[in-house]
């Protein structure tokens, strides 16, 4: 797996998606991946499950069994849960392997087919469900489970892959509208059952907000407002001058990234004239709480300027970790070809919410849906 493949996986891992201001729905998400080597589909699969954004399940490839992820899932969910999950994941993994077999543009080397299946229950009790398919880390098809409406990115490769796969599904008498609705209903039943068990108790962790400054040329200052260690993921972070939010094109937002401990981090930066620090504040809103944070001035400004604490550093670290995670198994593949390639871990992909359903959700995944204009901006500004 070369650098291009790694970058594709990173694109999936870090979708450019500005979070919505509304409360997050309850969600259940499964992430499955199968591999082929030189045209031959490998046995086994890798799968993980997330409940309300938190890992609760991992498929043990050696024991061929779903196992709890985290002490909280192990304590609350009984043995019957893992029997049911094992049976369902095994069936889904076999179905994904059959689909990979029928992708006709496979060439030599290692290739992957990944499915992310999501169902949600919103505050108004409405439900949504979808599946998203990736070949070699590139999204090529999104499907609404309720309406069976499909969204395909603009690239010719994605169009070809989507047509190939959907034609294969049409040949399967089991792939009917009733089948897809039953798929969504099963996911929603599990989600409701897990919520009733108390395993997905909502928690709120307020962000830690830090404002730093760095001097630039001609008397301008770059001020950066960083929020970290917060949960849930939705947050509004923006700069204000004299109490009024700055225009969108005068600010730069970072993506909302995982901190690695189940919480998130993000930042927003802008440039101001030195000496006008007192006119600017960073406004933060999270889970109904809000606050303003002033720009440090005087000695504090000098001290902050001497630091190299800038948002691009923290944003680059998770990417570096992911490259290591993805590249190490690739090195193993080259040295142990006789044993077959190891499956690439999906944990880094599962740390990010994936929308369900329509064209907007495909855009939130970081890819352009068919017949749609460019959408997301990577902003953490509230909508």
UniProtKB/Swiss-Prot annotation:
It is found in: Cell membrane. Residues 23-309 are extracellular. This is MHC class I polypeptide-related sequence B. Keywords: Adaptive immunity, Cell membrane, Cytolysis, Disulfide bond, Glycoprotein, Host-virus interaction, Immunity, Immunoglobulin domain, Membrane, Signal, Transmembrane, Transmembrane helix. Glycans are attached at residues 164, 210, 220, 261. The keyword Ribonucleoprotein does not apply. GO terms for biological process: adaptive immune response; gamma-delta T cell activation; immune response; immune response-activating cell surface receptor signaling pathway; killing of cells of another organism; negative regulation of defense response to virus by host; response to heat; response to oxidative stress. One of its GO terms (cellular component) is extracellular space. Changing residue 80 to E: In allele MICB*002, allele MICB*007, allele MICB*008, allele MICB*014, allele MICB*015, allele MICB*016, allele MICB*019 and allele MICB*022. Induction: By heat shock, oxidative stress, retinoic acid, IFN-alpha and the DNA methyltransferase inhibitor 5-aza-2'-deoxycytidine. Induction by IFN-alpha is impaired in patients with chronic hepatitis C virus infection. Down-regulated by human cytomegalovirus UL112 microRNA during viral infection which leads to decreased binding of KLRK1/NKG2D and reduced killing by natural killer cells. Residues 331-383 are cytoplasmic. It comes from the Eukaryota. Belongs to the MHC class I family. MIC subfamily. Changing residue 136 to N: In allele MICB*002, allele MICB*007, allele MICB*008, allele MICB*014, allele MICB*015, allele MICB*018, allele MICB*020 and allele MICB*022. Unlike classical MHC class I molecules, does not form a heterodimer with beta-2-microglobulin. Binds as a monomer to a KLRK1/NKG2D homodimer. KLRK1 forms a complex with HCST/DAP10 in which KLRK1 binds MICB while HCST acts as an adapter molecule which enables signal transduction. Receptor-ligand interaction induces clustering of both proteins in ordered structures called immune synapses and also leads to their intercellular transfer. This is associated with a reduction in the cytotoxicity of KLRK1-expressing cells. (Microbial infection) Interacts with human cytomegalovirus/HHV-5 glycoprotein UL16; this interaction causes sequestration of MICB in the endoplasmic reticulum and increases resistance to KLRK1-mediated cytotoxicity. It holds the Pfam family C1-set. Widely expressed with the exception of the central nervous system where it is absent. Expressed in many, but not all, epithelial tumors of lung, breast, kidney, ovary, prostate and colon. In hepatocellular carcinomas, expressed in tumor cells but not in surrounding non-cancerous tissue.
């Amino acid at each position: 797996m070369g650098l291009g493949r790694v970058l594709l996986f990173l694109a999936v891992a870090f979708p450019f998606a500005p979070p919505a201001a509304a409360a997050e729905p309850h969600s259940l998400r499964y992430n499955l991946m199968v591999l082929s080597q030189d045209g031959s589909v490998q046995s086994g699969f890798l799968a993980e499950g997330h409940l309300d954004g938190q890992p609760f399940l991992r498929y043990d490839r050696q024991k061929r069994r779903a196992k709890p992820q985290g002490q909280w899932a192990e304590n609350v969910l009984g043995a019957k849960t893992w029997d049911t999950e094992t049976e369902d994941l095994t069936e889904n993994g076999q179905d994904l392997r059959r689909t990979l077999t029928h992708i006709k543009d496979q060439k030599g080397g290692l290739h992957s087919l990944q499915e992310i299946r999501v169902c949600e229950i919103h505050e108004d009790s409405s439900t949504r469900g979808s599946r998203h398919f990736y070949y070699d880390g590139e999204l090529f098809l999104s499907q609404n489970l309720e309406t069976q409406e499909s969204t395909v990115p603009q690239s010719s490769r994605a169009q070809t892959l989507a047509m190939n796969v959907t034609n294969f599904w049409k040949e399967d008498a089991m792939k009917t509208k009733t089948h897809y609705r039953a798929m969504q209903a099963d996911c929603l039943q599990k989600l409701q059952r897990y919520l009733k068990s108390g395993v997905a108790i909502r928690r709120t962790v307020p962000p830690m907000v830090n404002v730093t400054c760095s001097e630039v040329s001609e008397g301008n200052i770059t001020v950066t407002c960083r929020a970290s260690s917060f949960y849930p993921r939705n947050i509004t972070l923006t700069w204000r001058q004299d109490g009024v939010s700055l225009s969108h094109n005068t600010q730069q937002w970072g993506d909302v990234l995982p901190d690695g401990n189940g919480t998130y981090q993000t930042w927003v930066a802008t440039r101001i004239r030195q000496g006008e620090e007192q006119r600017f504040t960073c406004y933060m809103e999270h889970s109904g709480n809000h606050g303003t944070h002033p720009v440090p001035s005087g000695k504090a400004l000098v001290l902050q300027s001497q630091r190299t604490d800038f948002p691009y550093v923290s944003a680059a670290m998770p990417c570096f970790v992911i490259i290591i995670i993805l590249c190490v198994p690739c090195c193993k593949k080259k040295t142990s070809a006789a044993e077959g390639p190891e499956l690439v871990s999906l944990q880094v992909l599962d740390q990010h919410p994936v929308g369900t359903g329509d064209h907007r959700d495909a855009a939130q995944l970081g890819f352009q849906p068919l017949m749609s204009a460019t959408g997301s901006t990577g902003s953490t500004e509230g909508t």
